């Protein structure tokens, strides 16, 4: 059984992202990893949706969780007629897809794929939950393999012995970038901004880098400019929650200011991922506003006085003039020429 997660860090292995088995989905709680290794156990697809909304898993984790949630929904309705099962799964598709507004279109593609697998299983009389899980694993294999192709275009852009700055947690591309670098005999060091308020850079990106044997340093979110100036950063790279066809990149809030700093110091910014055909322009993206209370604390410890207000946009938009290239599985594209990515019929 081919597994594209082979050789990657613990938290990037499929079962340690999200996994369905016997009427339950377990999701690694990335809010507390690596201090604690705990899994949130969901007994219904609605609980999976809520776990995604509550940031139990982040970056690309929600897409795996969503697929496993669809398998769980199939288990929930297994005693119903075929027509009733299909109706139940269509409703679950909408529920899970709407977990977070900014990523709705990508999430809908994932859930629709699970729905198609369910329809085929119903026609063939196979267990629908297992068919969806098999589809989810195959989809993960395809995605990981696709990201591995992205890594093959990204790693040559990094000087051997150089310095890379990241942002938030790019999930699979972080692991694949490091795996590809090791296979090609290239070494570099990484600076990871901590990424408040959930500290994904400090807890997730830095842990993956360390687990895979790389020199990694965590910095606070207000240090990128200083570090770029003093530590000879060669490249800033991040993944994206959406890459609009007009060249705007939607990613974890803070990406814009790092790209501005990189531009100021003449450091290239490379964004990894495929353009989103569902987002012709940035105007089709809804920026999620989350509970502002989270900006008034750090890992559960209150840092601001009672009565002080918080402000918490989950994402920001980086304009194309700040981006040196979009690194895809088909090569590196100018952010001003993303329609060319689809010229091959993809």
Language-model regions, residue ranges each:
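Glycine/charged-rich beta-loop-alpha catalytic/anionic-binding loops adjacent to active sites
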Residues: 31-34, 39, 43-52, 132-137, ...
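Short, hydrophobic/aliphatic alpha-helical segments
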Residues: 40-55, 154-156, 298-307
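Conserved phosphate/anionic-ligand binding catalytic regions in large, soluble enzymes, centered on
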Residues: 54-69, 103, 165-169, 312-327
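Ligand-binding beta-strand-loop-alpha-helix segment within the catalytic cores
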Residues: 106-160, 186-188, 192-236
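Histidine-anchored nucleotide/phosphate-binding helix
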Residues: 173-183, 259
């Amino acid at each position: 059984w081919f597994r594209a997660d082979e050789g990657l860090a613990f938290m990037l292995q499929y079962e340690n992202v999200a996994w369905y088995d016997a009427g339950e989905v377990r999701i690694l709680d990335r809010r507390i990893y690596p201090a604690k290794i705990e899994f949130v156990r969901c007994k219904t697809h609605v609980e999976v949706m809520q776990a995604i909304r509550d940031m139990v898993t982040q970056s690309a984790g929600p897409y795996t969780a969503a697929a496993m949630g669809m398998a769980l929904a199939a288990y929930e309705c297994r005693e119903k007629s075929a027509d009733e099962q299909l109706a139940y799964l269509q409703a679950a598709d909408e529920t899970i897809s709407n977990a977070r507004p900014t990523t709705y279109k990508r999430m809908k593609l994932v859930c629709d794929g699970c729905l198609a697998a369910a329809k085929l299983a119903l026609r063939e009389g196979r267990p629908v939950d297992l068919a969806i899980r098999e589809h989810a694993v195959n989809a993960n294999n395809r995605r990981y393999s696709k990201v591995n192709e992205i890594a093959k275009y990204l790693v040559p852009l990094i000087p051997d012995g150089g310095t890379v700055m990241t942002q938030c947690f790019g999930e699979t591309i972080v692991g694949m970038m490091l795996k590809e670098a090791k296979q090609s005999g290239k070494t570099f060091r990484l600076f990871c901004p901590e990424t408040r308020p959930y500290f994904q850079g400090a807890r997730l990106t830095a842990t993956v880098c360390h687990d895979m044997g790389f020199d990694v340093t965590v910095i606070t979110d207000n240090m990128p400019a200083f570090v770029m100036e003093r530590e000879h950063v060669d490249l800033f790279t991040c993944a994206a929650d959406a890459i609009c066809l007009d060249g705007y990149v939607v990613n974890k809030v803070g990406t814009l200011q790092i790209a501005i700093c990189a531009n100021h110091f003449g450091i290239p910014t490379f964004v990894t991922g495929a353009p989103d055909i569902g987002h012709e322009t940035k105007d089709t993206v809804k920026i999620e506003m989350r509970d502002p209370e989270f900006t008034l604390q750090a890992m559960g410890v209150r840092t601001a006085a009672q009565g002080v207000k918080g402000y918490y946009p989950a994402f920001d938009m980086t304009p194309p003039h700040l981006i040196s290239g979009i690194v895809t599985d088909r090569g590196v594209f100018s952010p001003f020429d993303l329609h060319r990515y689809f010229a091959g019929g993809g």
